[in-house]
A protein has these predicted regions:
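Non-ligating segments of multi-cofactor redox enzymes
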Residues: 1-512
């Protein structure tokens, strides 16, 4: 057993209001520069819908994730070393700019400089790639906002497998959800296995997956290998880039920018301890629907004395273990089993999990589509949203989704009876296997969601990450693991590096 720590994230979809604040702040901080205009490390999609890029969940088309062989081994779906080498100069599984969208801006200056005329001046769109005038904007990262496109296009959503999409049309006005997406920072990242240059690595201290900008050669196999399509090619620098989980903030014990600015308080950050030796075993599980339960088994109890002892022997600091004991991610994913992984069938073991939304169930109940099971809506009676959520979060297994939804409904019914009627309805808790203490904790974390409860992030121990801190002082900033090799003419932000031989004339501030 080799114990490692991972900073994971949980998003409570039941509270997401679709405001896109997380997307805008992430965009302003990380990708508002030439070459990355089309890239959104964090984006919010409206489901059902085909998403961004188009049909990213259709792995028959994009070949993302892993596939299990007959002998029990797993390989990237895009193929082994020889297939990757054969297609290295012409990747057939690569999304084009039209699958994302052509980024644009508007000629706002024309509103100020237009000559006097009989018509009001207009700010027309202009491409940020070619600089040419765009006659028509045809797609965007949130084009399907609030079910904005016709159902004929949205029915291509891969999560409609084994769902009668035609019948779904009856519930179209009551079944909608927001899905914020970012890099999953997987335990078994397919992007790292797909990279011919070996430029993608996973940090041991916090599990964040990064791309070494010095080693990256722009082959773009990682884009095909990632089933979530959260790696983007910077056409200006010729490098691939992705969400870095705001690791400079994480190292300082601060939440990511998307989590810090979330209006709905839907994001939770915390540490999980896991057994790194079992990653291949879990990812090679025969039945795809068993992957969720198998991934739960890989997480270790941070209160177990044997786990604590082994973690210390494996170099996990005590501060990280203490953070894991207070982790909201562990509570929601392992203890309460409310949070579920996004498409575990990709076998990447994702580490950004989601609490399924109650809104489709409650809205349908209010519209009379759902019968009541005592005081709780009968989740089984609304098969379409349940099957859809199962395809999205548990590889089609409906039982974990049903349990999570029933537990959240039970918490609401219990707290309503307690606060409105002044009684404790213990029967509703017994029906879903929860104690009073667990429900009180769930209410505290889900409803009140204080800052210190949502974000439990230990500060990094940088003194243990390098052998000689004095020699590294003022060295090269964010070097991404390969030191100051200087192999690239651009830095991580796409700008040209300064010539170190330039002589800067000093300014004398005082007289001798």
């Amino acid at each position: 057993m080799k114990i490692r720590s991972q900073v994971g994230m949980v998003l409570n979809l039941d509270k997401c209001i679709g405001c896109h604040t997380c997307s805008i702040t992430c965009k302003n901080v990380w990708t508002s520069r030439e070459g990355m205009e089309y890239a959104w490390f964090n984006n919010v999609e409206t489901k059902p819908g085909i998403g961004y890029p188009k049909e990213w969940e259709n792995q028959d088309k994009w070949k993302g994730g892993w596939v299990r062989n007959a002998d029990g081994s797993i390989n990237p779906r895009i193929g082994g070393k020889f297939r990757v080498l054969a297609n290295i100069f012409a990747n057939p599984d690569l999304p084009t700019i039209d699958d994302y969208y052509e980024p644009f801006d508007f000629d706002y200056q024309n509103l100020h400089t237009a000559p006097i005329s009989n018509h009001q001046p207009v700010a027309r769109p202009r491409s940020l790639i070619s600089g040419q005038r765009m006659e028509k904007i045809e797609w965007g990262p949130n084009w399907e906002e609030i079910l904005g496109t016709e159902f004929a296009k949205r029915r291509k959503d891969k999560n409609f497998d084994k769902v009668q999409a035609d019948i779904y049309g009856q519930y179209e006005n009551t079944f909608m959800m927001y899905l914020p997406r970012l890099c999953e920072h997987c335990l078994n990242p397919a992007c790292a296995a797909s990279c011919p240059s070996g430029a993608i690595y996973k940090r041991e201290e916090d599990g964040i997956v990064l791309i070494d900008q010095e080693k990256c050669r722009g082959w773009r196999m990682c884009i095909s290998g990632c089933p979530y399509k959260k790696i983007y090619f910077n056409w200006k620098s010729g490098k691939s880039e992705k969400c870095i989980f705001c690791f400079p903030r994480i190292e300082a014990g601060m939440p990511t920018v998307c989590a810090e600015t979330c209006v709905g308080r839907i994001r939770y950050l915390g540490v999980l301890l896991y057994d790194a030796d079992r990653i291949h075993e879990v990812a090679s599980t025969v039945n795809e629907q068993d992957l969720y339960q198998k991934q739960l088994e890989i997480f270790l109890d941070p209160f177990d004395p044997q786990v604590i002892e082994q973690a210390l022997n494996d170099g996990v600091p005590m501060s990280v273990i203490e953070a894991a004991q207070k982790s909201p991610v562990y509570k929601m994913a392992v203890d309460w089993k409310l949070a579920l992984p996004l498409h575990p069938e990709y076998r990447t073991l994702p580490m950004v999990w989601y609490v399924p939304p109650l809104s489709p169930i409650q809205n349908a109940a209010a519209a009379g589509h759902v019968s009541m099971d005592g005081v709780l809506p009968d989740v089984d009676s609304l098969r379409i949203p349940l099957r859809y959520l199962a395809n999205l979060l548990t590889a089609g297994d409906e039982e974990p989704v049903k349990l999570a939804l029933r537990r959240m409904l039970a918490m609401r019914a219990y707290k309503r009876a307690e606060q409105v009627d002044g009684v404790q309805d213990l029967e509703v808790l017994k029906s879903v296997g929860l104690s009073v203490a667990q429900v009180e904790d769930m209410y505290r974390y889900l409803a009140i969601a204080n800052y210190e409860d949502r974000y439990v992030i230990p500060s990094a121990h940088r003194e243990e990450a390098m052998s000689d801190a004095f020699a590294e002082r003022s060295g090269c900033g964010f070097s991404f693991g390969s030191g100051c090799s200087g192999a690239s003419d651009t830095n991580m932000f796409g700008a040209r590096k300064a010539n170190r031989r330039d002589i800067i004339k000093t300014v004398q501030l005082w007289e001798d």
